Amino acid sequence: MSSSKETAKSLIQTKSRSSIRNMFDEVAPTYDFLNHLLSLGIDNYWRVVAAKKARKQVEGEREPKILDVATGTGDLAASMAKIPGAKVTGYDLSPEMLAIARKKYPNIEFHEGFAEKMPFADQSFHVVSAGFGVRNFEDLAQGMKEFHRVLKPGGCAYIIEPMIPRNPVMKKLYLIYFKNVLPKIAGMFSKSTFAYDYLPNSVEQFPQAEAFTKILKQAGFKKAEFFPMTFETSILYVATK
């Protein structure tokens, strides 16, 4: 096993906050470029889908307050900021990712910290969103409890994650791309090759569909649904407090 794959395997097992933060600090300079390249630009569409659902939910609110957790370079926060009257806050553990987010979106407020213990008051937000980040939480169950805690009654969490297709043929093609092609392409542009060995393994290890909605309900959400997107290569979870 290569040192890159060994590092990725170790990170999957520990999900150490400091190691995750260091990984994202390292990939920050090429993160946006590779995200769009490796998803063929479809990642932008997935964010729009989540923002449209959130917009419908907060319709009638004069100033909907939205928290985007694991905001990274801020793209999902920016999609949410297009909701009329929205006041959006981005939150992430990586200072390097946040530095890019602040340059890209100076009108959005960004804060640094860990999802498992957020500095926001109970019932502060109408919406909590997270794009491609919750599978990296050191303590997933505690992170979801925090999502629930900071939401207002009736508020919703919108969580986007990669999905392994259930169709056998699609699954086989997806895993070939994810495990063999993607890391090689990423290695041409990013100095952190292990991050793209970590990615497919983290997706495989993450509880998918019904398994994750069960965790959301255990965190206190009264309703949790999922919506597969783009041939089941991505999935949107919507959880209602």
UniProtKB/Swiss-Prot annotation:
* Claim: Methyltransferase is one of the keywords in the record: yes
Catalytic activity reported = a 2-demethylmenaquinol + S-adenosyl-L-methionine = a menaquinol + S-adenosyl-L-homocysteine + H(+)
EC number(s): the record gives 2.1.1.163
Spell out the Gene3D superfamilies in the cross-references: Vaccinia Virus protein VP39
Q: What class of enzyme is it?
A: transferase
Function summary: Methyltransferase required for the conversion of demethylmenaquinol (DMKH2) to menaquinol (MKH2).
Instruction: Return the protein name.
Output: Demethylmenaquinone methyltransferase
